[in-house]
Amino acid sequence: MSSELKVGYRTVDGLQIRYADSNGSASQHLVLTSPWPESLYAFDRMWSRLSGIARLLAIDLPGFGRSERRIDLLSPTAMSEFLIRILDEWNISDPHLVCPDVGTPAALFAAAGHPGRIRSLVIGGGATAYPLEVAGTLKDLIEAPGIDAFRSVEPRALVEGLMAPIGPAAPAGDIIADYVESNMGDRFAESARYVRSYPEQLPLLAGLLPRIFTPVQIIAGGRDPIVPVTNAEFLHARLPNSRLDVLDTGHLAWEEASGEYGAIIAAWVNGGYLVGNTGMGRT
């Protein structure tokens, strides 16, 4: 593997969880959770930059990446409590959480349920609006009568189809191979249980948003065909202390514009989160 990430496994609540730890001595902690159907290697190209400003811990959430799953964790509310369990396991207090894609609703539930436990959030690219505003494969996954139809999805075709729109911005072949392996067997279909909980979970989240005073940096792709930017705008309009940056990308903003994405995180961690509600930027 050509990545800078040093990966290991740790047992948390009986599950083997894959993680990468920068082992730095910085006073601030940055905890990053994997997007789906990718893995913690989605942060590879910003790892060096971010490890210079904070100690990093990247996690494949249960059921995603290469971590073991447990069915009862496959909803944002349940995953939010597992996120807090991760922080306890690593003895991390007052972290910044970077939770794109499926991590977004879980991170928001964690902030709502544990005021003061999390210093700030960096989120986006995950469905959060209610009524739901989703499209493409995500819409199909949510609206299908069951998950059996997705058991035959070929992982390489799935990953290569997701990466095709970003062309040369796609990661190296060994990282693509990790994404493929992360969805082998029944992993993709079973992980779909998480997004299929959105119709019940997102109305609950919507009611909590005005009471989340944790600073929140939202990063969205302005051309996202799966999770339209209206999801980010929905959050920004309701969160009392948020900033929204819209990048000129599709869904995979963290891959397609990894430099800009990492720069926004760095600026946020270096004090941007202290500024308060700063409106919206487009780049």
Model-assigned labels for residue ranges:
Residues 187-237, 248:
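Conserved serine/cysteine hydrolase catalytic core
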Residues 99, 103, 107:
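Gly/Ala-rich beta-loop-alpha elbow adjacent to hydrolase catalytic centers
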Residues 132-134, 152-211:
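Conserved alpha/beta-hydrolase catalytic His-Asp/Glu region
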Residues 242-283:
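Catalytic active-site module of serine/aspartate enzymes centered on a nucleophile-bearing elbow/loop
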Residues 15, 21-66:
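Conserved HGGG/HGGXW glycine-rich cap/lid loop of the alpha/beta-hydrolase fold
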Residues 13, 20-23, 58-99, 263:
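Active-site loop/oxyanion-hole signature of alpha/beta-hydrolase fold enzymes
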Residues 112, 119-150:
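Flexible "cap/lid" loop of the alpha/beta hydrolase fold
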Residues 1-16:
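N-terminal cap/lid segment of alpha/beta-hydrolase-fold proteins
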